[in-house]
Amino acid sequence: LRDYVNKSGFDGVVLGLSGGIDSALSLAIAVDALGPQRVQAVMMPYHYTADISKQDAAEQAKMLGVHYEIMPIEPMVEAFMGTLAESFAGTERDTTEENLQSRCRGVLLMAISNKKGLMVLTTGNKSEMAVGYATLYGDMVGGFNAIKDVYKTWVYRLARWRNTQSPAIPERVIERPPSAELAPDQQDSDSLPDYDVLDAILLSYIEGDMSAEAIIAGGFDAEDVYKVVKLVDRCEYKRRQAPIGVRVTPRGFGRDR
C-alpha cells in the first residue's frame, strides 16, 4: 500500500469509515503503512446508519489519531431522489435506492481525493467481491483495496490478530453482526449465507476449483451452493472494474501481485 501510494504520487489516502469491520481493518492497515498523518477517514451517515456505528467509527479514528470528518449524505440522496422521482414513478423501492446511498459516498470521497491529493481506498473483502455484494461506482470507487483478496472470515481473524499487537479496532466492531446499513434492520445474512458457510463454498469453488456438484457432495446445502456459484459467475463484470489490491491467495481476482 505504501509503495503504491508513493509511486502513484498521492500525499496519502482517504477512506469511508462506516463503523464496520472491513473499513476498520482497512483503516488500521493504512495507518500501519503510512502513518496517521497521511490518512483521512470519513463517516458518511444516512437514516439507516446505527448510532453505535457512528460511535465506533469516531472511537477508532481517535484511537489511531487520523483526521476524521462526518459528512451526512441525506441532502445528496434526497436531491437525487427528487430528480429521479418522475422517472421512478409507479415503481417499488428496491436496491436502486440503496445503491444511490453508496454512490453518494463515492462522490464525496472522490471529491476529497481530487482536492487533497489523497488516494481513495476501497474496503470490500474477497467474499463480497466474489458474489458482487458491492456497488459499482459506489463503494467500489477508489484506487487501491488492501483487503480485496481476504475472505470475510479472515478479516475477523486479521482484526483480532492486529489488536494483539496494539489496540487498533474497537472490540464491538469485531463482535457485531455485519451490515451494509442501506435499509432498515439490514444484515448481510439477509442476502447471503452466513459467512462461515459462504467462505467455505467460495474456497472450494475458487481456490479448490471444485464443481457445484462436488461441493454439494461434501455436505453443503444445494440451494446455497448453486446460488453462490451463480453469483460468482455473474459478477465477473463487477470484479473487472474493481481497483487493484494485494494478492494473498493462489486464485486472486484480476492481475494483482
What residue spans do the PLM features occupy?
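ATP/NTP-dependent adenylation/nucleotidyl-transfer catalytic domains that generate, transfer
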Residues: 1-18, 23-257
